[in-house]
């Protein structure tokens, strides 16, 4: 079955949203790791 344009747009929108959240989560994870490394150096 072929998707309609509106279905494709919706899927693309959801996919973009998921990707953005994953990228944000990875970035936050990296920031947390750096913060931990820095704080352990100072204590």
Swiss-Prot record:
Transmembrane segments: none annotated. Keywords: Antibiotic, Antimicrobial, Fungicide, Immunity, Innate immunity, Secreted. Expressed in mucus-secreting tissues. GO terms for cellular component: extracellular region. It is found in: Secreted. One of its GO terms (biological process) is innate immune response. Shows antimicrobial activity against M.luteus (MIC=4 uM) and E.coli (MIC=12 uM), as well as against the yeast C.tropicalis (MIC=4 uM). Shows a pro-inflammatory effect, since the topical application of the protein induces an increase of cellular recruitment characterized by an increase in the number of leukocyte rolling. Does not show hemolytic activity on human erythrocytes (at doses up to 100 uM). Belongs to the globin family. This is Antimicrobial protein PcfHb. It comes from Potamotrygon cf. henlei.
């Amino acid at each position: 079955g072929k998707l309609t344009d509106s279905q494709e747009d919706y899927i693309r929108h959801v996919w973009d949203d998921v990707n953005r959240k994953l990228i944000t989560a990875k970035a936050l994870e990296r920031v947390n790791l750096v913060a931990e490394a820095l704080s352990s150096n100072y204590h």
